């Protein structure tokens, strides 16, 4: 039963790992990441939706590691850019992944677009896959509404956080504390939905 108290987060992004660890710290649950399994290669994200990518990663890695795996696929959806960068958020400016280059590209494409027309949302799809073949993956999602700023603000977070304005706090996402961000973030909301859906033995309750 000991391995039931462990979950692998399917990412090497330490910003995401910290968010998962903070959100799960009240449970008797050990959070590991792909950094703990250096021999495992990240799964190529070939899905056309956030949900498809999350399930693809969780299912593949769960079978490889024989472990419970949480995978998320998340990104930024900007209305004025017809939904871009969307599922390509991490590589919007091309390879290799570069947060600053991605931000620069979004700001460039929104140049001269008025603030009230820069509505956007963060979207997160979370999938949990189990090594037992008879258990279907659990899938949930969460969103966070906001606007795209004209320039970076704040030092916290990662990804597009410095240009994402949260009206509730009147701050950029990167200006929020971890607790503030977890309360309203797309990933935080998805994880709270996940808590209601995953089996009791997974949470160790």
Curated annotation (Swiss-Prot):
UniProtKB keywords: Hydrolase, Magnesium, Metal-binding, Nucleotide metabolism, Nucleotide-binding
GO biological-process terms attached to the record: nucleotide metabolic process; purine nucleoside triphosphate catabolic process
Gene Ontology cellular component terms for the protein in this record: cytosol
Chain positions recorded as Mg(2+) binding sites: 44, 73
Essential cofactor(s): Mg(2+)
InterPro entries noted in UniProt: dITP/XTP_pyrophosphatase, ITPase-like_fam, RdgB/HAM1
KW Phosphoprotein (keyword) present: no
Reaction(s) catalysed (UniProt annotation): XTP + H2O = XMP + diphosphate + H(+); dITP + H2O = dIMP + diphosphate + H(+); ITP + H2O = IMP + diphosphate + H(+)
EC number(s) from the headed UniProt entry: 3.6.1.66
Active-site residues (renumbered): 73
Note on how the cofactor is bound: Binds 1 Mg(2+) ion per subunit.
Pfam families in the record: Ham1p_like
GO terms for MF: dITP diphosphatase activity; ITP diphosphatase activity; metal ion binding; nucleotide binding; ribonucleoside triphosphate phosphatase activity; XTP diphosphatase activity
Protein family membership: Belongs to the HAM1 NTPase family.
Self-association state and partner proteins as the record states: Homodimer.
Function: Pyrophosphatase that catalyzes the hydrolysis of nucleoside triphosphates to their monophosphate derivatives, with a high preference for the non-canonical purine nucleotides XTP (xanthosine triphosphate), dITP (deoxyinosine triphosphate) and ITP. Seems to function as a house-cleaning enzyme that removes non-canonical purine nucleotides from the nucleotide pool, thus preventing their incorporation into DNA/RNA and avoiding chromosomal lesions.
Name of the protein: dITP/XTP pyrophosphatase
Species per Swiss-Prot/TrEMBL record: Bacillus cereus (strain ZK / E33L)
Organism taxonomic ancestry: Bacteria, Bacillati, Bacillota, Bacilli, Bacillales
């Amino acid at each position: 039963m000991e391995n039931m108290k462990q979950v692998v987060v399917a990412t090497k992004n330490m910003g995401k790992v910290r968010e998962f660890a903070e959100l799960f710290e009240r449970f008797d649950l050990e959070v590991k990441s792909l950094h703990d399994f250096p021999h495992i290669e990240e799964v190529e994200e070939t899905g056309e939706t956030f949900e498809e990518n999350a399930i693809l990663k969780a299912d593949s890695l769960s079978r490889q590691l024989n472990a419970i795996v949480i995978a998320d696929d998340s990104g930024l959806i900007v209305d004025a850019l017809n939904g871009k960068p969307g599922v390509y958020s991490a590589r919007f400016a091309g390879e290799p992944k570069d947060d600053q280059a991605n931000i620069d590209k979004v700001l460039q494409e929104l140049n001269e677009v008025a603030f009230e027309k820069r509505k956007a949302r963060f979207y997160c799809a979370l999938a949990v896959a189990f090594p037992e073949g008879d258990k279907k993956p659990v899938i949930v999602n969460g969103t966070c509404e906001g606007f795209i700023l004209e320039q970076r603000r704040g030092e916290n977070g990662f990804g597009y956080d410095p240009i994402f304005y949260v009206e509730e706090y009147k701050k950029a996402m990167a200006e929020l504390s971890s607790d503030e961000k977890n309360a309203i973030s797309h990933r935080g909301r998805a994880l709270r939905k996940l808590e209601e859906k995953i089996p009791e033995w997974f949470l160790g309750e």
